[in-house]
């Protein structure tokens, strides 16, 4: 397996692009998350069907088309993860713990899903969990209210990802 090159530069460029939002740490990972203990936004460059479903969920739930302000699903996902940080104090411990339990059940259901349609329904349950929905709502509202900032972030992030892909020989 070839070594991945330029990860530090990519993380640094994304961190710089997200500086207006107070993001201190970013890390390329295999999964998306916001790590509250280390105040780290973890992101993935893996594209999958879930991205399409997330777009559809945003459109159907918030009447927002990803791309309206020039952002792509990657940036709206970044904003979603930041949204977890921004909305965590609005969720009671009881509700948050219930969300964690439901996420475990959802993961088991996804692992056992037999069809794409079944997996989509399960993912929608995940998207609708209180903590996930609030983070997405925050992301959408931020994108709506800060169009110029979002366009600037999108440009910087897209350029950094393109350079990373080029350095690693990734093509469309």
Label each PLM-derived region with a short phrase:
Residues 1-8, 12, 148, 152-155:
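Short Lys/Arg-rich cationic patches that frequently serve as NLS/NoLS or arginine-rich RNA/DNA-binding motifs
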Residues 3-4, 87, 97, 123, ...:
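N-terminal low-structure segments adjacent to metalloprotease catalytic domains
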Residues 18-26:
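Short secondary-structure junctions
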Residues 26-73, 82-89:
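Active-site scaffold of zinc-dependent metalloenzymes
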Residues 85-113:
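Conserved, surface-exposed functional patches that form binding/active-site neighborhoods
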Residues 102-172:
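Metalloprotease/metallohydrolase-associated module, dominated by Zn2+-dependent proteases
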